[in-house]
Every structure is written in C-alpha cells, then in structure tokens.
C-alpha cells in the first residue's frame, strides 16, 4: 500500500487516514500493519463486510460535514486513501455506491498568497536554512515534496558577463516526472552560502549532497561533531520548519471558532506566490505552467519551448520573484539613470 506512493508526505497523510478508518471500525491489532493485514484478509473473504464498514465510516464523516466540523474535501481524501488501500490489497469494492453520495469538495482553496511584508518577516526567523528555502520555493514554484530529491548537483548557476542571472534546477531528478525550472540570483546566493557554511563546518560537500540537511551543535569545534554526519531534511522536515517559523514570527494565530483555514498555507502558498508574480511580470501563461510542471493539455505534445526561450521569459519575472524585489528594481533604475547621465 505504502509503496504505491513515492512522496513521504503523501505516504504519511494516506497512512494517517487509513489508520483513523481502522480505529473507527475497531479493527484488532496493536500496529497499523497488523490492522491492515486483518482488514485485508477478512475483506477479501467477505467483501460485504468490507463495504459495510467503509459505508459506516463515510456516513459518520458526512455527518461531521453537516455539523461544519470538516469539509467535503476531507471526506473525499478519506475515500481516496481507503480506495487505494483496498486496490493494493485486492479487495473488490463497488466504489460507485460509495462515491455517488459524497459531498463535493472545493477544487481550489480560498486562501491567499503571503504579502511581501509577511515574507520579509518570515525570513527573519533564526534558522540558517529559512532564507534558502523561502527564496528557492518562491522563485521556482516547486512543491515542498521536491526537497526529498534535491541534491547540490541538480542546481547550476547561469552566468552572463561574469554575473549570475539565474540558476537552473532539475526537479525530481531521475524520476518519471523529472523537469527543470529556474531560481533567482538571490536564491542561488542563499543556497551557495548555506552549502559553503556546511563545508567550512566540516561536512564533505559534493554533488550528491542533499541541499537541505539537519542542523548541528555549533559549539563543537569546526571539522568535528555532527556537522560531518549530514542527515537529509525531508519534505516533512521542511514543512515543519516553515510552520514553526510562521508561528514564531507572529504570522499565524489560533483559528477563530468556525474557521478551518489560516490566511495562507505554510508551503503551498509559495507555489501560488510564484505563479501570481510571474503572471504580474507578464510571462507567457504556458511557460509558467511548464516551469511548474503543470499539464497544459494537448499542448504537452506540441509545445516545445527551448530552455533558452523559457529562461528569457523567466528573466522578465526576476525582480517580481525576489523577496527584496523593490530594492532590485530601485537599483536597476539607479543604474539606468547613471548610464543616461
């Protein structure tokens, strides 16, 4: 069941939902694995029993929707998780009987993107990794799950006249859904500084080094201690770091009664921020979708923009994607005035 999901965060969510289902229908077993085997064995021998338990669980969740305790989308996600488990366990279930009466979930969230002021406050959080993470996600539009695969060799600076104008980043390298996007010069600087800091602290950094890793005790002399034993910071670790930073910086407060969503999501909001800022900058919509690895319908088979063409369009958005975009724009205007004078 878990092997059907590549991303650790996805596995964790599906596992949690299935576990709640097993607990609700009182499946015996001390561990999730024991409960899963029990349900799978009994479900294959008695599909009516399996269907009855699933319907009972879904009916309970629908009542919670009516009470405004959860959203319809939450119920849909429960069904997806249980359905995947049953398919992997070869339990034949008539899913039309279950899905026909499901409450409809929104196809989009009604949250917003963070403001420039909020992002500037976020990167003040006292963790050496936060700037590199925020700058990278905001200027590339990658999903938080991409950090599970991102190694140092997957990011390469692009120079013009001896100056870094952007950096190319290969996302999900070696996987079926591998693609490339770009990051801003400021994101490249933050990442390079972070990798340099790790190297001077004693870590043997190379192309295979994961871009994000755990922190270490800086009180230990350089070249010694846990700095030399890097442990990859998974996408779940990045997610938790971002959430800690948002709370610590006063950008998130306890939800008011009746509200289920915070103003903006901790990680996915940066992907939305990227798309919005690129649109404001005037990038071609199809190029934005390409850099986000979104499907563009039939154009997937016919639209073949070159890397250079995508880069040129992306460069138009650099000043809009930089957290210090106002400063960059001001510096650009100053340089233009100097040239005219």
Please report, for each region that a protein language model flagged, where it lies by residue.
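Basic, Lys/Arg- and aromatic-enriched nucleic-acid-binding interface segment
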Residues: 116-145, 271
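Conserved tyrosine-mediated DNA breakage-rejoining catalytic core shared by Y-recombinases
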Residues: 149-208
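Flexible interdomain linker/hinge and immediately adjacent N-terminus
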Residues: 38-44, 91-121, 172-176, 217-226
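Active-site/catalytic core of tyrosine-dependent DNA strand-transfer enzymes
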Residues: 185-261
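Short, charged phosphate-coordinating catalytic segments
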Residues: 137-164, 283-290
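Short, basic (Lys/Arg/His-rich) helix/loop patches that form interaction surfaces
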Residues: 204, 239-290, 294-295
């Amino acid at each position: 069941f878990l092997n059907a999901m590549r991303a650790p965060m996805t596995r964790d969510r599906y596992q949690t939902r299935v576990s709640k289902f097993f607990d609700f229908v009182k499946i015996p077993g001390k561990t999730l694995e024991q409960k899963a085997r029990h349900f799978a064995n009994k479900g294959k021998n008695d599909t009516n029993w399996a269907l009855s338990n699933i319907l009972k669980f879904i009916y309970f969740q629908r009542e919670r929707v009516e009470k405004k305790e959860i959203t319809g989308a939450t119920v849909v996600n429960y069904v997806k998780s249980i359905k995947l488990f049953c398919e992997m366990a070869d339990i034949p279930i008539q899913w039309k009987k279950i899905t026909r009466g499901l409450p409809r979930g929104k196809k989009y969230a009604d949250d917003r993107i963070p403001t420039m002021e909020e992002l500037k406050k976020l990167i003040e959080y006292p963790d050496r990794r936060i700037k590199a993470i925020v700058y990278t996600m905001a200027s590339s539009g990658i999903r938080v799950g991409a950090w599970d695969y991102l190694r140092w060799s997957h990011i390469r600076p692009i120079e013009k006249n001896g100056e870094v104008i952007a950096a190319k980043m290969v996302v999900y390298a070696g996987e079926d859904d591998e693609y490339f996007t770009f990051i801003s010069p400021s994101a490249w600087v933050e990442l390079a500084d972070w990798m340099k800091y790790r190297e001077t602290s004693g870590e043997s950094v190379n192309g295979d080094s994961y871009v994000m890793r755990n922190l270490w005790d800086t009180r230990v002399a350089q070249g010694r201690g846990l700095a030399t034993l890097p442990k990859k910071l998974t996408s779940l670790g990045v997610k938790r770091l971002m959430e800690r930073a948002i709370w610590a910086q006063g950008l998130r407060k306890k939800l008011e009664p009746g509200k289920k969503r915070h103003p903006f999501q901790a990680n996915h909001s940066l992907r939305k921020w990227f798309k919005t800022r690129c649109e404001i900058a005037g990038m071609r919509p199809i190029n934005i979708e390409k850099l986000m690895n979104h499907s563009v319908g039939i154009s997937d088979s016919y639209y073949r923009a070159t890397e250079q063409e995508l880069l040129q369009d992306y460069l138009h958005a650099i000043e809009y994607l930089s957290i210090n975009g106002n400063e960059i724009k001001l510096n650009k205007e100053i340089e233009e005035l100097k040239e005219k004078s």
